[in-house]
């Protein structure tokens, strides 16, 4: 059965003026309104890998060292001396000999001491002593201006026991042998005071006391050289 043409055209016009609504035609019907100032979308990324372990120091073999004591006589005092004298510890033959078989050597202790003799009971003596770095040699009049310097007197009514003057290695460079040469190793300077009675004796003046130096050297890294046969 066919509809009249005028009815068919009227139905089509009505559909065009009022299109049917459907929830499926509106993709945002079930979605909440989104504010223009904020977005709910989030970026999801893979978790970061674990941090690598902290670096550690490379294990090194501990340095093997040996402690060698030394002692030597530096100066015999007769009371006829004047002015002053000085000594570099690193260049002293006794110290050089001890450290010769090793590449590295450092002082762990160092001291000078005066050993009186019986003659000092008749001929008392006086000296000024100080420790400095190797590149500093104070004049006789400057010795007591050095921190730690001492004026030492012995004999007669003064005590005759050994008198010590330790070196303060925290203010001096204790390394006496290394791959390089240092100018701040320990140096001992002594200022003398003449005794007129000893001067009158001339060359027959007795030894009234001796200045000795002793200490301990830590030596390491033996030098690879032929082993001596004797």
Curated annotation (Swiss-Prot):
Region (Disordered): 19-54
Low complexity composition bias: residue spans: 19-48
Subcellular location: Virion
Pfam families, sorted: Tymo_coat
GO CC, any one term: T=3 icosahedral viral capsid
GO molecular function, one term: structural molecule activity
InterPro entries according to UniProt: Tymo_coat (IPR000574), Viral_coat (IPR029053)
Keyword entries, A-Z: Capsid protein, T=3 icosahedral capsid protein, Virion
Keyword Kinase found: no
Family per similarity comment: Belongs to the tymoviruses capsid protein family.
Function, in words: Self-assembles to form a T=3 icosahedral capsid composed of 180 copies of the capsid protein. The capsid encapsulates the single-stranded RNA genome.
Record's protein name: Capsid protein
């Amino acid at each position: 059965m066919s509809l009249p043409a005028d009815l068919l055209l009227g139905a089509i016009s009505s559909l065009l003026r009022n299109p049917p609504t459907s929830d499926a035609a509106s993709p945002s019907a079930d979605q909440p309104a989104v504010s223009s100032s904020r977005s709910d979308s989030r970026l999801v990324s893979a978790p970061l890998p674990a941090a690598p372990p902290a670096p550690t120091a490379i294990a090194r073999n501990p340095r093997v060292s040996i402690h060698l004591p030394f002692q030597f006589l530096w100066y015999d005092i007769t009371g006829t001396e004047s002015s002053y004298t000085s000594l570099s510890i690193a260049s002293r033959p006794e110290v050089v000999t001890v450290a010769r078989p090793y590449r590295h050597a450092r002082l762990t202790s160092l001291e000078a001491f005066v050993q009186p003799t019986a003659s000092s009971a008749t001929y008392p003596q006086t000296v000024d002593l100080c420790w400095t770095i190797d590149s500093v040699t104070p004049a006789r009049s400057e010795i007591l201006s050095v921190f730690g310097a001492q004026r030492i007197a012995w004999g007669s009514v003064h005590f005759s026991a050994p008198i010590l003057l330790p070196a303060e290695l925290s203010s001096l460079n204790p390394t006496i042998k290394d791959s390089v040469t240092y100018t701040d190793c320990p140096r001992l300077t002594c200022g003398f005071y003449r005794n007129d009675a000893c001067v009158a004796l001339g060359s027959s003046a007795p030894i009234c006391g001796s200045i000795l130096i002793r200490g301990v050297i830590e030596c390491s890294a033996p030098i690879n050289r032929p082993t001596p046969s004797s």
